[in-house]
Amino acid sequence: MKLTNVGSFDNIFDFVKHKIGIYQNREKTMETLFELMFSESENTMAEISDGYRIRKFSYGQIKSEISAAAPTLSEQLSDVPLGKMVGIYMSNSINWIKVLWCVIMCGYRPLLMNTSFSDAILEDILKKHDVGAVISDKKQFSVLTVLAEDALKPSDKKLDTREFGTEILFMSSGTTENVKLCAYNGENFFYQICDTYNIITQCPSIATHYKGELKQLALLPFYHVFGFIAVYLWFGFFSRTFVFLKDLNPATIQNTVKKHNVTHFFAVPSVFERVHKAVLSKVKAKDKKSYKKLCRALKISNSLGKANKAFAKSALKEVRENLFGDSICFLISGGGGIDTETLKFFNGIGYHLANGYGMTEIGITSFEKSASPKQLVKGSIGSQFGYTEYKVAEGDRLFVKGRTRASRIFMGDKIINTDYDEWFDTKDIVKVEKGRYYHCGRSDDLIVGANGENLNPVIIEPLLTVENSNGVCLIADESNSPVAIVSVQNCFSVTRLDGIFNAVERAITRANLDSVIKKVVITSESFMDAGEFKVSRKRVRRKYLSGELTTIERSRASEHIQTASVRLEQEIIDIIAEILERDASKVGATDHFFHDLGGTSLDYFMLLDAVRNKYSVEISEATSENLHSAREFYNFIRTTV
C-alpha cells in the first residue's frame, strides 16, 4: 500500500533519508529538533479513545497549541532564571509533549521526573540540583509548582525572543544516594536520530506500516530514556502516530491496541512476560489438549525461520486475535533480560519481538535486527548502532563510546562532562557470538563463592525457578554466602508453600549447587517496586539484610497463611467498595453484590476484571455464576491461586 504520510515520497526509506539529510545541514539545537519534528503538519501525531470515538490530533495542531501556551508558562515562571532546570512530573499524554516543548521554548532545561520515585528522593533531587520549578498534572512540590492545565492555557501574547533550552535531563534509577541526572543536548539526539536510517535498512520490519499507518503505543514512560528515545524521538521525528492510553489496566492496553490498530509497542521484559504467562494460564485452564497443541505449534513456528509468518498467520490466528490482533508489526523489549520462552511465544505466534539494550547514561545503542525467529528467540541484543562503539574487556564487561551518550552527568555535587573518546564502563557482562552481543548479567551482582568462583545470578536464577513461584533472586548474605530468595505472591496454601520449598531444594541439587547455596527463603513480596523496570538485586539484598523484606519461615507457614487469608477477604471487600463507591465498612463479607449492594452488570464486569488482574486468576462464565459476595470470591481465590 502506497504511503501518503511521507511528504513527497512514496516510501518510508526515502523519507527518512531525506529528513536526516535536512537535519545534517542545520544546527544541532533543540530548536532545530522542534521545527523538524513538527514539520509534517498534516500528519496525525496522536490518537486517544474518547468513549466509542477515536480522536485524532495533527502535528500542526499540537505545534500551534504549544506556541500559544508558551507565553503563559513564561509568565508563570517569570521568577525562575532562564537556563534553570524545570521538572516535569506527569504521566504519558499529549499534554506531556506540549509541556516538554513549552519548557524548552521558554529557555529552560526540562528535568524528566520519574513518577515512581518516592517524595523523599524527588525532593532531595529538587534541592540538590536547585530545580527552579515543577510542572505537574496533580502533585505539589516544595518548589514552585505549576499545574499542567494552567501552564497550557493559550495566550494572545507572543513569546519574547529567547534561546531554546539546551538539554533534557533524565533520572537514572536508584536510591537517594545514587540517582544520577543524565543530560542530553541537541547533538546527542541528532546522532540517535541519524542511527535510524541504518536501522531501517538493516531491519526493514521496524518501519512496517499497517493500512498505511505506523502507530506507536505510548506505553513506556517518556521520562525514561528508553521511552523518550526509542519511542518518542525515533518515531516523533518522522511524524508517526502515538496512541495514548487512558490507564494501564491490561484490558485497556489490549482493547486500545485492537481499536486503534497499533503497529508498534516497546516495553520492559516484565510486561511481555506477564502477557505470555497469562495466555498460557488461560489455555491451560481451558484443557490440557489445547495447551499441548499450542506448545507444539509454537515449536514448529519458531523452527521455520522466515517462513514462520505464513504458518503463524494460519495455525495461530486465534491466539493473535485473542491477544492484540493482526495490526502488530514490531515489538522491542528493553531495560533488562527477557525470558527465552517469552521470546519464543511472541515470535512463534507471528509477532516480531526483538531484545534491545541501552542505559540512561548512554542512550539506546542496539537491538537484535534479524528477521529470523531462530535468531530473535536467542535473546541477543544485536550489534551496536552506527554512531556507537562496543568493546569487551576486564572480565567480559561491556564498554561503550559514541556521540549518542549523555553530554554530561550530574552525580551528587559533581558534574562530569563526557569525553566522547573515552570508554564508558556499563558494568554489564556480555558474551559475543558472530558479532552479536548477549547480556549475561551485572558484574556488581556477582557473588564470590567460598571456592573463589563467581556465581552469576542471571545464569543460576532460571535454574531455580519453579512452578507456582513468581521468580528467584540470588543474593549474598552478610557473610557473603549465597541465599536463594523465592517470591511467592498471593499464596493461601501451606501445602503449596511447602511444595515450593521442596521444589527449589531439588532444583539446587539438580544444578549441583548443594554445597554452594545452603539457604532458601520465601518472600510474599514482589522483587520489583512499583515503577521499576527490572529487579535491583542490590535493593533486594539491602531489604533482606535490614529485615525490611517480608520473609516466610518454613516452620511458621501456617501462621503466614492465616494472616494472608484474613487480609485477602478485606482486599476483596475494598475492591468491591471502590467499584461501587461505598464505604468499605458498609460492605459485609457475605453481602450479595446485586441484591444487597445494588451492583449493576457493568459494575460486576469491572469487579471480575479487577480480581483477574490483581490475583492472576481465570474466571470462566460458569464460575462467575457462583461468585456474588466477597466471601465467595475469597473462597474461590484461596482454592485456585
Language model region names:
Residues 392, 396, 427-513, 609:
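AMP-binding/adenylate-forming catalytic core of the ANL superfamily
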Residues 65-71, 182-209:
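Conserved structural elements of the adenylate-forming
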Residues 58-60, 167-195:
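Conserved AMP-binding A3 loop
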Residues 193-215, 222-309, 313, 317:
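Conserved AMP-binding/adenylation subdomain of ANL enzymes
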Residues 52-57, 72-117, 219, 311-437, 443-446, 460-461:
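Conserved AMP-binding/adenylate-forming
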Residues 42-44, 153-171, 177-178, 204-215:
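Conserved pre-ATP/AMP-binding loop-to-beta segment of ANL
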Residues 447, 505-562, 585, 608:
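Conserved C-terminal "lid"/linker of ANL adenylate-forming enzymes
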